């Protein structure tokens, strides 16, 4: 059974000293596995935050193209690093602000919601 195999792999990782897991796709980790990791003190970075670099790099490319610029690898890398640090800070701060310190799934969800809600309010949509 797939779920049994997945849970077994989680136990093996835990016994081998795994301290952090970053999702590498859109929600590949089951809710049960996420809960297991969190309950066992494993830092869990959800895909919506951990994978934001791909979307951010696409946005940087579109910006570069629209302005007819040509950035070096180091320039793009510095901009991406700044974006990812900002995403991480927003995720961590949101989780802490709402009483879920260390729960990066909760933090990423809250921070994402706040960003969309703020944009909607700024546009007068709500």
Each language-model region and where it sits:
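Adenosine-phosphate binding glycine-rich loop
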Residues: 15-126
């Amino acid at each position: 059974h797939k779920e049994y195999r997945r849970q077994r792999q989680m136990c093996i990782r835990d016994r081998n000293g795994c301290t952090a897991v970053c999702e590498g796709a859109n929600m590949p980790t089951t809710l049960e596995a996420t809960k297991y990791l969190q309950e066992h003190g494993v830092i869990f970075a959800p895909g919506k935050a951990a994978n934001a670099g791909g979307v951010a790099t696409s946005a940087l490319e579109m910006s570069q193209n629209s302005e007819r610029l040509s950035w070096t690898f180091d320039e793009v890398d510095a901009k991406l690093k700044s974006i990812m640090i900002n995403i991480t800070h927003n995720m961590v701060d949101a989780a802490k602000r709402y009483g879920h310190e260390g729960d990066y799934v909760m933090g990423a969800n809250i921070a994402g919601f706040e960003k969309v809600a703020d944009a909607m309010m700024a546009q007068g949509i709500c």
